[in-house]
Amino acid sequence: MKKIIFALFFILAIVSCQTEKQGRTAPWSKEKANEWYKQWGWLRGCNFQPSTAINQLEMWQAESFDPVTVDRELGWAASIGMNCMRVYLHHVAWDVDKEGFKKRMGQYLGIADSHGISTIFVFFDDCWNPTYSAGKQPEPKPGIHNSGWVRDPGDLLFEKPELINLLETYMKDVLTYFKDDKRIVLWDLYNEPGNSAYGDKSMNLVQKAYECAWAVNPSQPVSIGLWNANLKEFNKVQLQNSDVITYHHYRDLATHQQVVDSLKPYGRPMICTEYMARHFNSTFQEIMPMLKAENVGAINWGFVAGKTNTIFKWSEPLPDMEEPPLWFHDILRKDGTPYSQEEVDTIKALCGK
């Protein structure tokens, strides 16, 4: 009898291992997600783009990859207590140089890890410019927020539906390569799906992104962030399929608290992967203490003011102004000095620095 029980246990163990290797068909359980979250403590940081890169392609292409700036600026982030960065990828940078792209991702992870910083990688994005190309990227347009940022895959997917096959290969290649990398906190599969008036056209890629991630079954959780309460079908799919709840919120403390309270019943860890817009009263002094108290990850938009021009407000160009009187995003100037010492003091105090 003992032999039979042992044999049955052994068979079940093999089946379990095979299932694990073959992928999964559902999100993590709440218990697994919450146990995963405990190991990280309170995640806080920013959406990181080195000040020398106008967009994802300039960050990741071989000719413009800038590890010196990355190292310097992540050192500044660590010095004020940040421990997690959200970083955008782009399939074109992978497509033109697959092995080099993954090598540079690894190099970035090594630099971040040397500063005690973990990483959330983002695959797709429905925001800003609809078209893009490999090679030299445009110079910033004065006073215009994110003048060179590019979507991924953008309009090209609707013009060439067969691109979905390349995107699947891209996702699976990157996820497989880094599936057990402990320097990666989470895979953010798609930034703000349905934005740029794409609406339901983005749903197919949302579903494909989850399928690809589940097929690879990385050791890290996957998520797609909530960002628009009116996109009810997207929100339903994202809440049903994400291991960890991620979301964006750029408004004041009262409305942000309402969002957090509305998501608590789902019983999963939460990370706010975009916040902090000074014009809308989404500030470090107001929002960050609440997020810490609620044990919600706090990832603001922007760190060092640079080529992205995100010190300027959305849709309010100021082409004749080098610097607006009130910065929209970002924390430090290019020399590492703060836009607001009060803000940096708040961040450091909350992070125990």
What residues fall within each predicted segment?
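Bacterial Sec-dependent signal peptides at the C-terminal "C-region" and cleavage site
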Residues: 12-26
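Sec-dependent N-terminal signal peptides
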Residues: 4-13
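Active-site mouth of glycoside hydrolases
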Residues: 23-242, 248, 253, 266, ...
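Catalytic domains of carbohydrate-active enzymes that cleave complex glycans
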Residues: 349-353
